[in-house]
Amino acid sequence: MTTKTMKEKATELLQRCEVVTLASVNKEGYPRPVPMSKILTEGISTIWMSTGADSLKTIDFLSNPKAGLCFQDKGDSVALTGKVEVVTDEKMKQELWQDWFIDHFPGGPTDPGYVL
């Protein structure tokens, strides 16, 4: 019988979750947690999400990239800390585009308001 590491368990839990809570630090120094739909994960170190270029969380992360992230499923939960990078790369935006984003970004993958 093999025993999974905490990192393996956390990775599996993250894969099951559709929504995570991402917390930025606002200009007053307070945490600002928001629910976010995850697009793609690479282990537990890279988690892709989309948002608006002018959203409060984007503004927060551009001035302070420190973040908290938590996710849970059926009583199991994980809380992580790290840094957020706001990505505007057109190739990545196209690659990670999902049809339901059109409601938020009517210009499609090239909409200047769409960032990762």
Task: Describe the residue ranges of each PLM region.
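Charged, gly/pro-rich active-site loop segments
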Residues: 1-2, 79-116
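Short, positively charged
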Residues: 1-5, 57-58
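Onset of an N-terminal alpha helix
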Residues: 3-11, 15
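A short, Trp-centered hydrophobic/proline-enriched beta-strand micro-motif
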Residues: 12-27, 67-70
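Short glycine-rich loop/turn motifs
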Residues: 19, 33-36
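General beta-strand recognition
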Residues: 21, 46-48, 79
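Residue-level signal for well-ordered, solvent-exposed loop/turn and beta-edge residues enriched
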Residues: 28-30, 83
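A short mixed-secondary-structure module that forms the rim of ligand-binding clefts
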Residues: 39-75
